[in-house]
């Protein structure tokens, strides 16, 4: 089945991996910026990643045979204060690229003052550029997850950003109902530290009247989890969910949310 992976960190994946992913049926992907960096860096490190995303990654997608789109942001961990301010200043220029379809990952992980400042600033940038956002939230097993997701939603509302243009990513069972009640899209990340495919499929099957609310993604950045989105689709097929409903979840929903120019 053809699908779109709306959260795929291709900058960390080699050509062989991307070929395997394309062979599973992925026709397009959205490449988000990481929410954190491993170390302490100045602005040049982030600008280099942005440049790769809007140049090499787009060309590589065309060469291998999938459409690549980009979501950019300033990470809330791993930059000096000077680097953070410089990236915020430079970000609007990068958003002029037609293949930049969102801001993200933005959001909160532990709720520090810096995270909140950056989150608010980038929500305003997204609003001024009429772009949706991909919001990072704590992994499903994080004890502080329920509290942080409440803070995330509160900040979005305080900044008057439209909830229907938000993906609250990395959903877990304990925060699922709250996310659904928020009015945002619910990001069902399917990877080793988020949810397994069967859990994602069960949430979808138990909410068949709300299929338009789900965004299924792999969040793949390393390892061999090439097949997680197709595995969700297969689990839904085994449960006899109609083909058109599965297609809606794994293709039509991300296409519509990001307004991707695809068939």
Where are these regions (language model features)?
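Mid-to-C-terminal alpha-helical segments outside catalytic/metal-binding sites
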Residues: 230-263
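Short helix-capping segments at alpha-helix termini
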Residues: 61-65, 157-162, 208-210, 238-244
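Active-site/ligand-binding-proximal alpha/beta "capping" segment
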Residues: 88, 94-95, 208-209, 229-241
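Mid-domain alpha/beta scaffold segments of enzyme catalytic cores
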Residues: 1-129, 137, 150-151, 165-166, ...
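Catalytic pocket-lining loop regions of alpha/beta-barrel enzymes
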Residues: 123-206, 215
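Short acidic/histidine-rich active-site segments
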Residues: 210-227
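Short, acidic/turn-prone active-site loops that include or flank metal/cofactor-
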Residues: 33-36, 190-195, 220
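Short active-site-adjacent structural elements
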Residues: 195-196, 223-227, 258-259
């Amino acid at each position: 089945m053809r699908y779109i992976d709306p959260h795929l960190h291709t900058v960390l994946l080699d050509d062989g991996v991307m070929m395997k992913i394309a062979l599973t049926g992925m026709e397009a992907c959205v490449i988000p910026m990481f929410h954190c960096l491993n170390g302490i860096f100045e602005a040049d490190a982030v600008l280099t990643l942005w440049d790769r995303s809007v140049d090499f990654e787009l060309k590589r997608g065309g060469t291998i045979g999938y459409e690549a789109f980009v979501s950019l942001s300033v990470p809330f961990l791993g930059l000096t204060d000077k680097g953070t301010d410089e990236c915020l200043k430079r970000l609007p220029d990068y958003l002029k690229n037609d293949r930049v379809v969102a801001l993200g990952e933005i959001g909160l992980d532990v709720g520090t003052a810096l995270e909140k400042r950056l989150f608010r600033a980038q929500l305003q940038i997204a609003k001024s550029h009429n772009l949706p956002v991909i919001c990072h939230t704590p992994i499903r097993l994080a004890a502080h997850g329920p509290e942080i997701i409440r803070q995330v939603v509160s900040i979005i509302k305080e900044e008057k950003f439209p909830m229907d243009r938000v993906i609250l990513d990395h959903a877990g069972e304990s925060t699922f109902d709250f996310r659904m009640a928020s009015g945002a899209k619910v990001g069902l990340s399917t990877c080793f530290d988020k949810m397994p495919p069967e859990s994602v499929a069960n949430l979808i099957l138990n909410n068949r009247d709300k299929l338009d609310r789900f965004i299924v993604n792999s969040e793949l950045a390393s390892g061999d989890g090439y097949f997680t989105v197709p595995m969700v689709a297969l689990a839904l097929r085994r449960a006899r969910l109609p083909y058109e409903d599965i297609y809606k979840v794994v293709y039509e929903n991300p296409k519509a949310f990001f307004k991707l120019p695809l068939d």
